Amino acid sequence: MTQSVPAIFLDRDGTVNVDHGYVHEIDNFQFIDGVIDACRELKEMGFALVLVTNQSGIARGMFTEEQFLSLTEWMDWSLADRGVDLDGIYFCPHHPDGSVAEFSETCECRKPLPGMLLQAQNELNIDMAASYMVGDKIEDMQAALAANIGTKVLVRTGKPVTAEGEAAADWVLNSLADLPKAIKARYK
């Protein structure tokens, strides 16, 4: 059996890109400063990069799954063009109060539940204890806890950081851009 690898699990909106609210078009997608360089450095450090994102706008009828997939393909290519290959992309299109019947449900994949993270663990052979979850909301931290991810990192680039969010996180950083330096400092 191949050796498991550590991963950086990344929330999307507010962590990788500026959260303009239900981002689903290329014209509205803006990488947060320093994120691409940080992702490249994290890959060089031996981490798998795994995107895990709730996309309730699909269930709410704000955009289609096809629109989301088109934007995701563009984002993936944009990162690859800059030397960053994502190892996995997982998304939850569901919401219990959705207006699109096929996606209006309570599921196991929507954060704070750990479904997407556990699916990635199984498919990519991830060492969860050596991994990091990076997100801008308490739900990201709760999903990481439920999936037994070693380090929960809350970033200030998205939703306002709450006391509950800080308490649920192991680290609070200004941005994903600060993560490589923080990890290196941990192992000095």
Swiss-Prot record:
Pathway field: Nucleotide-sugar biosynthesis; ADP-L-glycero-beta-D-manno-heptose biosynthesis; ADP-L-glycero-beta-D-manno-heptose from D-glycero-beta-D-manno-heptose 7-phosphate: step 2/4; Bacterial outer membrane biogenesis; LPS core biosynthesis
UniProt-listed Enzyme Commission number(s):
3.1.3.82
Quote the record's binding site residues for Zn(2+).
Answer: 92, 94, 107, 109
Q: Which residues form the active site?
A: 11 (nucleophile), 13 (proton donor)
Q: Which GO terms describe its biological process?
A: ADP-L-glycero-beta-D-manno-heptose biosynthetic process; lipopolysaccharide core region biosynthetic process
Q: Which Pfam families match?
A: Hydrolase_like
Q: Which cofactor does it need?
A: Mg(2+); Zn(2+)
Superkingdom of the source species: Bacteria
| Residues binding substrate | 11-13, 19-22, 53-56, 110-111, 137
Which Gene Ontology terms cover its molecular function? D-glycero-beta-D-manno-heptose 1,7-bisphosphate 7-phosphatase activity; magnesium ion binding; zinc ion binding
As for subcellular location, the record says:
Cytoplasm
Among InterPro entries, the record links this protein to: HAD-like_sf (IPR036412), HAD-SF_hydro_IIIA (IPR006549), HAD_sf (IPR023214), Heptose_bisP_phosphatase (IPR004446), Histidinol-phos (IPR006543)
Marked site positions, Stabilizes the phosphoryl group: 53, 111
* Residues marked Contributes to substrate recognition (site): 110
What do we know about how this protein assembles, alone or with others? Answer: Monomer.
Protein name (Swiss-Prot/TrEMBL): D-glycero-beta-D-manno-heptose-1,7-bisphosphate 7-phosphatase
Q: Which organism is it from?
A: Yersinia pestis
